[in-house]
Amino acid sequence: MANGNFKLSQLLNVDEMSAEQRSHFFDLMLTKPDCEIGQMMQRVVVDKVDDMIRERKTKDPVIVHEVLSQKEQNKLMEIYPEFNIVFKDDKNMVHGFAAAERKLQALLLLDRVPALQEVDDIGGQWSFWVTRGEKRIHSCCPNLDIRDDQREISRQIFLTAIGDQARSGKRQMSENELWMYDQFRKNIAAPNAVRCNNTYHGCTCRGFSDGKKKGAQYAIALHSLYDFKLKDLMATMVEKKTKVGHAAMLFAPESMLVDEGPLPSVDGYYMKKNGKIYFGFEKDPSFSYIHDWEEYKKYLLGKPVSYQGNVFYFEPWQVRGDTMLFSIYRIAGVPRRSLSSQEYYRRIYISRWENMVVVPIFDLVESTRELVKKDLFVEKQFMDKCLDYIARLSDQQLTISNVKSYLSSNNWVLFINGAAVKNKQSVDSRDLQLLAQTLLVKEQVARPVMRELREAILTETKPITSLTDVLGLISRKMWKQFANKIAVGGFVGMVGTLIGFYPKKVLTWAKDTPNGPELCYENSHKTKVIVFLSVVYAIGGITLMRRDIRDGLVKKLCDMFDIKRGAHVLDVENPCRYYDINDFFSSLYSASESGETVLPDLSEVKAKSDKLLQQKKEIADEFLSAKFSNYSGSSVRTSPPSVVGSSRSGLGLLLEDSNVLTQARVGVSRKVADEEIMEQFLSGLIDTEAEIDEVVPAFSAECERGETSGTKVLCNLLTPPGFENVLPAVKPLVSKGKTVKRVDYFQVMGGERLPKRPVVSGDDSVDARREFLYYLDAERVAQNDEIMSLYRDYSRGVIRTGGQNYPHGLGVWDVEMKNWCIRPVVTEHAYVSNPDKRMDDWSGYLEVAVWERGMLVNDFAVERMSDYVIVCDQTYLCNNRLILDNLSALDLGPVNCSFELVDGVPGCGKSTMIVNSANPCVDVVLSTGRAATDDLIERFASKGFPCKLKRRVKTVDSFLMHCVDGSLTGDVLHFDEALMAHAGMVYFCAQIAGAKRCICQGDQNQISFKPRVSQVDLRFSSLVGKFDIVTEKRETYRSPADVAAVLNKYYTGDVRTHNATANSMTVRKIVSKEQVSLKPGAQYITFLQSEKKELVNLLALRKVAAKVSTVHESQGETFKDVVLVRTKPTDDSIARGREYLIVALSRHTQSLVYETVKEDDVSKEIRESAALTKAALARFFVTETVLXRFRSRFDVFRHHEGPCAVPDSGTITDLEMWYDALFPGNSLRDSSLDGYLVATTDCNLRLDNVTIKSGNWKDKFAEKETFLKPVIRTAMPDKRKTTQLESLLALQKRNQAAPDLQENVHATVLIEETMKKLKSVVYDVGKIRADPIVNRAQMERWWRNQSTAVQAKVVADVRELHEIDYSSYMFMIKSDVKPKTDLTPQFEYSALQTVVYHEKLINSLFGPIFKEINERKLDAMQPHFVFNTRMTSSDLNDRVKFLNTEAAYDFVEIDMSKFDKSANRFHLQLQLEIYRLFGLDEWAAFLWEVSHTQTTVRDIQNGMMAHIWYQQKSGDADTYNANSDRTLCALLSELPLEKAVMVTYGGDDSLIAFPRGTQFVDPCPKLATKWNFECKIFKYDVPMFCGKFLLKTSSCYEFVPDPVKVLTKLGKKSIKDVQHLAEIYISLNDSNRALGNYMVVSKLSESVSDRYLYKGDSVHALCALWKHIKSFTALCTLFRDENDKELNPAKVDWKKAQRAVSNFYDW
């Protein structure tokens, strides 16, 4: 029956039986099928099945191609039983159920139309009608947005496919279908009788009649009326004389009550926000559907509406799932009859709200202290019981704890008359608390005690309503008008200094004192109402406002100042009550309104509104013009883009929300009569007008000379009589004759190039400052490129909404909707990027961001036509842009100042020296860090200096941003941690301060200046070697003796300490971040920012209050106890260098615990210092004398013998002992149960943006397999079971452990430079082919190379290109664990390797393309570049034979970790450029970009889904080649490969041979900051590539596999039988033939000693290894069968084994 798609309830009327009857029925059917009643029941079932089959055969079949689950198929048949649905399951697409449902709904609508009548399809499904031959239907398909364009293209492709099938004979077309198909023959995109791209209102395809458009009498609309206003629909139906429209639309009646809810039948949801309603589908990557809420509500309510003498009547006739099917009738010439409020919503059934009531609850917004209301849905029984209980409490019992206790105890089970009744829907715990508070307040308000208390409070206070404060506010508004007048009169830019209107703290209460009323300040909601309404009525009294105008003005003010009105404020006069659901719905449906008032003529409403606004404006202008003859209320201000926003005039100016009294404060000085106030106030305004007239001409002339970037009005505030002005005087920004720009916005130009290096002058101070400006400008350009790249990707749809963990902290703000499209993780950015679409390239502006409760409230310039603005990490702080603006105006002559350096060890008292030697009243004191600056200010304050210390002691950034006008100068400049700053910054500080002497505190061995732009080469960044005087300090007051012992190795002179602590440092080994010890109040220090983020999240999750900083951030600070943490096992050459080691170990005074996942130089130093005796440590105290130290030196000689035959010697014991000597303890570790223990014990994982499906755990450990038992015990891991937990572990340790090392990079420039180098160094330009790749022969060749299984999967998938989700990937894990050749297997549980791959259909699209591209790359590559792709050992040896054994080479190995996961947007763009170089089409490039940007991975087997950005997918169509290209490009960018003799690369492995003595800089820092690669550089005596040593023999170079890895793999525990072992033997024997040469064996012995730090000789073990490899009989002795018996070598089919082993056999 399941195959027939029938449900059991359809076979018999089971639903009409009682529960007992159903039980008997199933018992007889299942337990007694042979009894008479059972047989009768079976016959009934068979007859019923036959009847249903016959009935279905009479129906026309409806073919559903979408892939649906069995549950969805059953649901579809249950909702639409009238159709004979045939499921093909050959079209996989997003929200397939909804797509299939639309076809059936379209047929339902068409069935309502007479068979021979013409039909207009509004927003129609014309491609569906073509397949059914419905030639009477004309579809109006307007392209309103990009989604409609995409659908139109999809339909055209579908139509083309139908034609192709008809021509090939695969499809038979009916006569009607052929007619409809012929309409598209001339031009598929042109309008025709079948469809047009006009709106229903604009469609003229049926011609005209009497000057009006003709249309069909019937219309249908399938999910398209959302986008049509009801008025437009009615107007069109009237004009085209359409009688009836049948429609279907998603029906969400719950949206009238709650803002968000489910649409269960389509697995979707709705959401109301900002006047819009959103429809979307769960677990769906596509965009949501957005519609106007007010228009949707009209269709939802379905009220009869009259229009131009016609009444439009809504008739809802069926609800199918979440879709309402209804008709709109146009009725002419009859009086309208209204519906009662009970006729519509009473029929709507919402099952989860049955017997529930609506209860208002109240909450207080913590940030604003504003009372808000929301509706809560509670069971009526529960609510009645709670109200009854609270009403019976006495005054002493009426407490919040009692109310909460009762509500909580009855939330799940309600006790009525002693019986327990389970609540149908319990209340959320948070809402339950709010309900308790609301019910308590209701009861307390109802009792007279609270009334007496309120009266007592009101008698003790007196609100202010005098005219004095009112006129104070109005006067400032007048100054705003004058500022606008200056801007208009001078035709200049924005007004720089604004005077505002809205005080942060408004006047609230006053008390009578002998000196007059004393004002108090408080953020009071009530007082805002009093003050601002007083302003309105004061103005109204002057201008004789009419009542309606005044009321409108009051409403405007209330909206502007967020003074809420209405039901959300708790009304104590009307206690809280609840409403029945149906009554609540019915209250929304008003039947008393006439048709004309339900939908008024909008043009008339607009005219009335404009007239009312004009009256308000004229009244406001009347008052201003009466006092100021030059005032013009109609003036329009024109200005360049500004963050200040557009200026208004007239009434708009008076009502504008600004922030002026935040800069001015007023205080009461004396009591003045109202008459005196009014007289002096008005006279003051007249006097001020004369002053303004004098300012305008001079200011306009200044602007015309171009000496300022914007208008700056510097004038005194007008102070009403009785008040004194306490606003500090404003000083202009002037620097040595030049005007310093005060920038409110920055221009962001797309395609900007990095600036050119400045010319070297020969003067260090000049060159350093020029370079500093060059660096700041390069940083600005790189940041602009990153900002515009993010906006470009969002605009093109590469970055989409609905994702997680957006790159660079991206946030996208919709300017029109005033809401976040993509909400950033953090807000309060200093600037916001506002692109300007008027420009040809991607350009725009950075504007100062204005925030309010996490939302942007900027008034963006409309003329730029930007729909969206963005924020990101690059806009969070823009201090360097302001500094660049300020410093660019300064002269760059030589600095006449002497520079001194106090070079001291950590904790030597450099800050103390500043405090003791500096006088902040006359000297300038600067520091590079905020914490250090605050510490200096605090210590100066303790010494009692009379000056304002915060004005004299500053951070360097603050000094350069605010003091370039010469406001802070001194003869002596004290600069703390000067070596952390760029030398040019120090010179600038000395120049601005006018210093003659600069005393710099620093340490040449600690962290120096680190540039944030990787592409610039700085030559003058350091002051080291340029000081006039250097004073060394080698005594530390901070560091204990063991730290002093470590520091003594790195400093000249002897380091001594005053700290009495001897031993302070310990090492604690951890496996992961979960094991980090959590100590409240401790100071945690990490090496990397990524480690800091992990630790901050861990502390927050565990609710531990502690501070976390990086080593760089902690330089210059002191802590008592420090926990130094390393959670990343990979080595970073930047953050783990010597200077970081010194800073990390010298921050504490008492204790340091180093918790690390890996042994490194830091742990080595700590262990060595801990091993020192007390006597050894005593010499590092200040009181001890210096002891002499001696060291011995031994010369090492190595004797090398010539070649000879390899002896056939050695035993298994020799191999085991050699392995134990290399890796002590590895063979003792039994890992066979590791996977089982992990799977069956608790495991705490923290994963971001991961969805898991519970119940997918399967006990795979019960599956028993038999394997051979290895005799040799190595750390070869056991084969793992691929469980859900293993998938999550692998995802966490691999895909979610991506490094984030890249600094600011101008990606466009770096890509261009890299491509230029590729063409000049790697490829022969003459051999590069860029012709199109689309070639049938290439496709067929790729197809023939695929397996039969792959071909079958591709053929079975019949989706078209537009139906494929390219950003969706499959996820799996490998069960084999990669073996390690170190000691980590003893304590580390290795994560399995992950494979992220596309579907076969997508690979079949890209596979042939990339195969051709890679062949073209190999053909064009220079011969000394060796790309290890599909090469055997012999092939690789042949490619390196050209190396001369007589020549001397320097071999360089670069080891990169987390290579796939390091990819970001820059890598993707570079890869696309390489593809384009070799002929990739733009359409394929776009699809590839989309498929690698914002991606979703799904592990179907283990029930897991995650979101990943940009990472190179390990299983897509070009993984290995793309990785290899990235490796080559990175090395090409940072190493002089043009000098290389040989470059061998493949994947993330590389080996480069340079001529001996070639000089180059360590590339690892640049590979990290420019390319985001964690890497290490190796220079061993014997190089290695892809697990093979490159040995130099007497005649050539030769690659030989690493014997240590070979021996490790001989401990493999997953070899099935002797036949499998024979296959391994063939592969081993072939790849390790070089072990038969003793010259190779001896050199391998040296290689092992060099690589693995092995002090012994390995020749005997290598001989034993060759002995067991060269003979299969000997190899069999290394294994036993499952019964622990020896293997029989004779039981092998060698022919079968030979066939199984290919050139690339991997065992």
Curated annotation (Swiss-Prot):
InterPro entries: (+)RNA_virus_helicase_core_dom, Alphavirus-like_MT_dom, DNA/RNA_pol_sf, P-loop_NTPase, RNA-dep_RNA_pol_alsuvir, RNA-dir_pol_PSvirus, Virgaviridae_RdRp. It catalyses: ATP + H2O = ADP + phosphate + H(+); RNA(n) + a ribonucleoside 5'-triphosphate = RNA(n+1) + diphosphate. Residues 86-300 form the Alphavirus-like MT domain. Transmembrane segments: none annotated. CDD domains: Virgaviridae_RdRp. Residues 1449-1562 form the RdRp catalytic domain. PROSITE patterns: ALPHAVIRUS_MT, PSRV_HELICASE, RDRP_SSRNA_POS. Gene3D superfamilies: P-loop containing nucleotide triphosphate hydrolases. Residues 65-425 are annotated as: Methyltransferase. The keyword Cytoplasm does not apply. It comes from the Viruses. Keywords: ATP-binding, Coiled coil, Helicase, Hydrolase, Methyltransferase, Nucleotide-binding, Nucleotidyltransferase, RNA-binding, RNA-directed RNA polymerase, Transferase, Viral RNA replication. Pfam families: RdRP_2, Viral_helicase1, Vmethyltransf. GO terms for biological process: DNA-templated transcription; methylation; mRNA modification; RNA processing; viral RNA genome replication. Residues 901-1155 are annotated as: Helicase. One of its GO terms (molecular function) is RNA helicase activity. Residues 601-622 form a coiled coil. Its EC number is 2.1.1.-, 2.7.7.-, 2.7.7.48, 3.6.4.13. Residues 872-1033 form the (+)RNA virus helicase ATP-binding domain. Residues 1034-1187 form the (+)RNA virus helicase C-terminal domain. The replicase large subunit is translated as a fusion protein by episodic readthrough of a termination codon. When readthrough of the terminator codon TGA occurs between the codons for 1187-Lys and 1189-Arg, this results in the addition of the RdRp region. Belongs to the ssRNA positive-strand viruses RNA-directed RNA polymerase family. Heterodimer of a large and a small subunit. This is Replicase large subunit. It comes from Tobacco rattle virus (isolate PpK20) (TRV).
